């Protein structure tokens, strides 16, 4: 009788140990999974950076810093803690990106417009590589764009126009400043010459905002006094 009871206790003990072992294993697996999820969605871990997204948003000019003629919002000011969702023209510009932002403005009659984009890279070297991709795109796609002589800005800058008849009055300026690349698209239905004049004034202010961001200042440069 004693022997039977002892065997029963031993079997029960082993069974309980086995159950506990499985529970602990599952619990440990679940804990690891939860930890991974937090890391993947964190502000600085993984591919994005919330602090970089906040800097991107600060660089983009708000409505009250725009010229009086461009006080209609065409694209709401926003930023995201990730690379741009569309990585083309040029392809490869998203490599090393940790945040991006965009805003757009237009005139009341829609004849003029200005679109601002900014990409924040993990470091200045990544931004430099991305700018090289932009240069290659502009120089080697002559059927799409034409490199133009533009005002120098930042650590490096590039300006080009478009061959498409629907975009002949649009210019794009690309400005690299430390770990940032800002792009500015200016459109003026009056013609390419008017677009150049607008670009000169607006790009100067945008370049200042990029510089202020690299100096840990709150970007405050304004184009409110500019006539376009």
For the regions a language model picked out, list residue spans one by one.
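Short, surface-exposed beta-strand/loop micro-motifs that present aromatic residues
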Residues: 98-106, 169-177
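Short, well-ordered beta-strand elements
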Residues: 115-117, 179-188
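N-terminal "mature-domain start" segment
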Residues: 20-104, 200-203, 207, 214-228
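A short acidic-to-branched-hydrophobic micro-motif
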Residues: 99-131
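Bacterial N-terminal signal peptides that target proteins for export
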Residues: 1-7
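Short Gly/Thr-rich strand-loop-strand
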Residues: 72-86, 125-172, 208, 213-227
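C-terminal motif of bacterial Sec signal peptides marking the signal peptidase cleavage site
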Residues: 15-18
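A short acidic/glycine-rich loop-to-helix N-cap element
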Residues: 184-202
């Amino acid at each position: 009788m004693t022997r039977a009871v002892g065997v029963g206790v031993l079997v029960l003990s082993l069974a309980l140990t086995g159950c506990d072992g499985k529970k602990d294993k599952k619990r440990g697996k679940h804990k690891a999974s939860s930890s991974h999820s937090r890391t993947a969605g964190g502000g600085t871990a993984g591919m994005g950076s919330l602090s970089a997204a906040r800097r991107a948003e600060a660089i983009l000019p708000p409505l009250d810093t725009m010229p009086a003629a461009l006080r209609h919002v065409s694209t709401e000011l926003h930023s995201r803690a990730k690379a741009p969702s569309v990585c083309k023209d040029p392809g490869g510009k998203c490599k090393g990106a940790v945040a991006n932002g965009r805003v757009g403005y237009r005139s009341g009659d829609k004849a003029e417009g200005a679109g601002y984009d900014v990409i924040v890279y993990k470091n200045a070297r990544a931004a430099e590589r991305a700018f090289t991709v932009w240069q290659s795109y502009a120089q080697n796609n002559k059927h799409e764009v034409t490199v133009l002589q533009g005002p120098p800005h930042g650590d490096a800058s590039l300006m080009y126009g478009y061959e498409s008849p629907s975009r002949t009055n649009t210019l794009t300026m690309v400005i690299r400043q430390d770990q940032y690349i800002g792009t500015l698209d200016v459109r003026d239905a009056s013609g390419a010459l008017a677009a150049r004049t607008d670009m000169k004034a607006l790009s100067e202010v945008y370049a200042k905002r990029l510089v202020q961001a690299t100096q840990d200042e709150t970007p405050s440069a304004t184009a409110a006094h500019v006539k376009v």
